[in-house]
Design a protein with these regions (language model features):
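Amphipathic alpha-helical segments
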Residues: 13-25
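Short catalytic-site patches enriched in acidic/histidine residues
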Residues: 14, 33, 40-123, 175-194
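Generic secondary-structure signature for well-ordered alpha-helical cores
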Residues: 22-36, 54-62, 137, 141, ...
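Single conserved hydrophobic/aromatic residue that forms the stacking wall/gate
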Residues: 1-12
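Conserved short loop/turn motifs at secondary-structure junctions
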Residues: 10, 34-46, 142-149
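Extended C-terminal subregions enriched in glycine
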Residues: 128-169
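Charged, cofactor-coupling segments
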Residues: 88-137, 179-248
């Protein structure tokens, strides 16, 4: 059907997606450079930082950004608050989800969380970040052609109890010209037979995590994008993790 076809696409779509992701990550790098250089000077707002991503996307032939999901400090929790005029301080957390329509009209849907400061982030934030990294890495290792989507749901990494209430709406979703078919649900949100299909080579998927506690002082948002291959899954996005929050 149309949804499945959009999710799978063809070799040309996947080539365009690689271009869009590359462009997005170069734009993210400029945004990070701006944030780390300018926030410590004072007076830089969430909107100021987000505007850099917009400008860099347009410079590289991109089209638009669907959301305003960049927040800082305590405004990261709960997630889904839009960026605004809040001034970001040094030694604060900053998290974002690009939701970016880049070159060729293809979505680059990546998320990163940064600690804006020279020292290590606080221990509770590093714990959340490590949990988010493990969630994505574990779930990515599950991906292979022929795996039924409901079986995938029941095989997912389980977040710690304290992170369950605020976990993301889904750990994986299709991606193309925007968020696409399918949606891989968590077990407690599974609608039986809603996605009665198996993973196929060429299916483009985002794998993500949202980690934080109810009434906590932060949320960590991470998301990568890639494609199911003939023998597994290739993560196309390569933007580095923040070593102030995590080290391998």
């Amino acid at each position: 059907d149309v949804d499945r076809s959009r999710g799978l696409g063809d070799v040309y779509k996947r080539q365009a997606m690689r271009c869009s992701i590359y462009s997005c990550e170069r734009s993210m790098a400029v945004m990070e450079e701006f944030a780390r250089a300018e926030i410590p000077k004072g007076g830089v707002t969430e909107d100021d930082v987000w505007a850099v991503l917009h400008a860099e996307n347009i410079k590289r032939g991109g089209e638009w950004i669907e959301t305003r999901l960049l927040t800082s400090g305590p405004r990261t929790n709960p997630w889904f608050q839009e960026c605004g005029p809040r001034i970001i301080s040094e030694n604060e957390i900053l998290a974002f989800d690009t939701d970016l329509i880049g070159p060729y009209g293809i979505c680059a849907d990546l998320s990163r969380t940064w600690w804006i400061g020279d020292s290590l982030a606080p221990a509770n934030m590093r714990e959340s970040y490590a949990e988010a990294v493990e969630h994505i890495r574990y779930n990515t290792r599950l991906l292979k052609p022929g795996l039924h989507m409901e079986d995938l749901t029941h095989s997912l990494h389980v977040l710690q109890d304290k992170y369950q209430a605020l976990k993301y709406s889904s750990p994986m979703h299709g991606v193309g010209m925007c968020d696409e078919w399918p949606l891989i649900a968590y077990p407690d949100r599974l609608v039986k037979n809603a996605f009665d299909a198996v993973l196929e080579p060429g299916l483009t998927l985002c794998v993500e995590a949202l980690v934080g506690e109810v009434n906590g002082d932060h949320m960590v948002k991470l998301e990568d994008q890639g494609v199911v291959t003939n023998n597994g899954y290739e993560t196309i996005s390569t933007y580095p993790l923040d070593e102030r929050l995590f080290s391998n």
